[in-house]
Design a protein with these regions (language model features):
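Glycine-rich, positively charged active-site loop/lid region within alpha/beta enzyme cores that binds
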Residues: 182-203
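Surface-exposed cleft-lining segments at the edges of enzyme active sites
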Residues: 134, 197-209, 237-238
């Protein structure tokens, strides 16, 4: 249950007008397995997912380095196993690794014990790479289980970034508070750039990068004018990592910076939200 919100007048650091999170879901071909349920998923579709680790990730990391941005990558455990070198590059660049399922399993109704086992397995893999406790959670395909927040609190998570019920960060109360950093389908590159022959219900053509730039710029301007909001972009190296798209994203970053954005990673924003509400992360829980 949500019992505390911080949206009423939070002041972002250094007088910034809005908190912007450039988050990346590095799920490679496992995103496509989830979306299609492996229905007629041929190698062409699989290879589209593999574009992320093979090509797109490097462009994303290079752009982030040029702009001196440290952010959050949500990585399924199985991806960290298969593409260990690439995930090590993410961590070595100073970016946070956060939970995104073990096998990007998005089935509703996964038994709680099974999901907790998935969390433990994926956490161990990510922590072995980064040397840091996993404190962030994003449900695969946004399929947050009914017990999801309770399980995050039990396992000492600091924040979640799945729900879509408002434009500000808020706190799931409990013995161990968990900050929610909401996303929105309109801020997800999947909504504009995903392509698959395997499923008639998915997008079958991509939007021009300039169209997406203008949509995100307009949304940023309006949210920044309100002064207490967040804008959480959900990006995929296999999609945004195409050459013209990453150029578009970098142009957007420059515009946002010039117009009052605080661009930060999820953990940093979550800790700030807790502090602004007179709360602190449970150090013992987070250190587990």
């Amino acid at each position: 249950m949500i019992t505390l919100k911080n949206g009423d007048g939070i002041k972002w650091p250094h007088g910034k007008r809005i908190a912007v999170l450039l988050t990346f879901d590095f799920d490679a071909e496992y995103l496509r397995y989830s979306v299609t349920g492996q229905r007629a998923l041929g190698f062409s579709d699989i290879s589209r997912g593999q574009y992320g680790p093979h090509e797109g990730l490097k462009r994303c990391l290079d752009m982030l380095a040029r702009q001196n941005i440290k952010t959050t990558f949500f990585v399924p455990g199985i991806v960290a196993e298969k593409y260990a070198d690439e995930v090590k590059q993410i961590a070595a660049a100073g970016h946070e690794l956060a939970y995104h399922g073990y096998a990007h399993d998005a089935r509703p109704g996964i038994p709680e014990a099974e999901e907790e086992a998935n969390m433990a397995k994926a956490e161990a893999i990510l922590e072995a790479i980064s040397g840091k406790k996993v404190v962030g959670h994003r449900a695969p395909l946004d399929t947050l289980q009914t017990y999801g927040v309770k399980l995050m609190q039990k396992r000492g998570y600091l924040y979640s970034s799945t729900l879509k019920d408002c434009d500000w960060a808020y706190i799931h109360e409990g013995e161990h508070p968990v900050v929610e950093l909401p996303t929105e389908p309109g801020f997800d590159d999947f909504s504009f750039f995903y392509f698959s022959y395997a499923d008639a219900h998915t997008i079958t053509c991509s939007y021009p990068a300039e169209y997406v730039y203008n949509m995100w710029k307009d949304a940023f301007d309006e949210l920044a004018n309100e002064g207490d909001k967040i804008m959480c972009l959900k990006l995929h190296p296999q999609l945004i990592g195409r050459s013209s798209r990453i150029r578009m994203l970098e142009r957007l970053v420059l515009y946002m910076r010039q117009n009052g954005a605080w661009i930060a990673g999820c953990e940093e924003v979550a800790r700030y939200v807790l502090a602004q509400n007179g709360k602190e992360a449970d150090a013992d829980a987070v250190a587990k």
